[in-house]
UniProtKB/Swiss-Prot annotation:
It is found in: Secreted. Keywords: Amidation, Neuropeptide, Secreted. Its main location: secreted. The modification Phenylalanine amide is found at residue 8. GO terms for biological process: neuropeptide signaling pathway. This is FMRFamide-like neuropeptide FLP2. Belongs to the FARP (FMRFamide related peptide) family. GO terms for cellular component: extracellular region. The keyword Secreted applies. It comes from Macrobrachium rosenbergii.
Length: 8
């Protein structure tokens, strides 16, 4: 999983 995806 992308770290940026965790932002949502």
């Amino acid at each position: 999983a992308d770290k940026n995806f965790l932002r949502f």
